[in-house]
A protein has these predicted regions:
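Short basic alpha-helical hairpin corresponding to helix-turn-helix/winged-helix-like nucleic-acid-binding
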Residues: 58
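Per-ARNT-Sim (PAS) sensory domains and their PAS-associated C-terminal
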Residues: 61, 66-76, 91
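Sensory-domain boundary capping and coupling elements
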Residues: 94-97
Length: 120
């Protein structure tokens, strides 16, 4: 829950095996998605894109797919990474999602240490 990004891992058989939990997840996840085909976790209109990414990763044609969208007034960055073992065998896909809205609002510079949140 301390990560500034949301992580979801889909295995080589296209099944959701892990997702990070946190109070500010961009896309809500419940434990019910674990073991489910990732295609069943996306709107029907985008399943063909999911299939294309997975096919390209599996075949080694691509390593990263990247999107950014406006969602409920937020600027959301979504990246997919092919995960491979040292021998190059495809193990699955890691989805990394981040709300970049606060970062897009930054201006100027901060060169000195300044904490914005209190210690836990």
């Amino acid at each position: 829950s301390a990560l500034p990004v949301d992580l979801t891992f889909v295995d080589a058989e296209d099944r959701v095996r892990f997702f990070s939990e946190g109070p500010d997840r961009v896309f809500a996840r419940s434990k019910a998605v674990l073991g489910r085909l990732v295609q069943h976790c996306h709107p029907p209109k985008s399943v063909h894109i999911v299939d294309q990414i997975l096919s390209d990763f599996r075949a080694g044609r691509q390593r990263v797919a990247e999107f950014w969208i406006e969602l409920r007034g937020r600027f959301v960055h979504i990246r997919y990474f092919a995960v491979r073992n040292p021998a190059g065998q495809y193990l699955g896909t890691l989805e990394v999602t981040q709300d970049l809205t606060p970062l897009r609002a930054l201006t100027g510079e901060r060169r000195l240490l300044q904490y914005d949140t209190p210690a836990a």
